[in-house]
Amino acid sequence: MLSIIERFPKKQTPYSSNQNIVGIDMGEIHSFSCYDSNHNACIVTGRQLRSLNRLRNKQLGEIQNLQSASTKGSNRWEELQKAKMKILERNSNQQKDLIHKITRNTIDWCIQHGITKIIIGDIVDIARNTKNEKRLNRKNRQKMSNWATRKLLHNLAYKAKSEGIMIEVIDESYTTKTCPSCGNHKKPKGRIYKCSCGYEFHRDLHGARNILLKGTRGKIEIYPSDNVPQNPVTFEYINS
């Protein structure tokens, strides 16, 4: 349920204005990559969250194999079922704690930099659209369409609103592939997005800035007057 997140009509507002707006790109390794109107940037890592999920899946897989060799309803099968429930409960509590820290750190950074509005890519709706292979491949859907991703978005929106920060969710299609300098579409490889026109930028912050551009201008394009810093870009790295 995403009732606390508002969707606004498309606007074309200046990239830089009296408001400091931040674009946020969500990811599996870096939960939130942020880039604002004043060219401040930060990355809030979600590595621990991914590690928790991997450990949970490994443990559940081992139990499932043992249960397959047991008779359903037997004492052994029931013991394994209880162990499975304990793993799920423990993992859920650990995830909730990490999600709180990740979203709290992100909102604290927004407050520190005077952010008045968050524009974030709508990966949850994309992940639900399982027939649209062009927008998100199956592997990425499995990574992003999960409980943790939805909770991250919920918690971020809740904390933002409690601090008086507006939040807008937009279609994030092409924000990772589009070069804002020449408009070329290129699938990023490695940690740096590189285009044949000479544009280079940190891959995750490239996506966040394109979300900011798309949400404020209605198109992914930078102007010479933007005074955009060149790669390597300076950013804060926050380990939750």
Where in this protein do the model-derived segments appear?
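Positively charged, helix-rich recognition surfaces that bind polyanionic ligands
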Residues: M1-S240
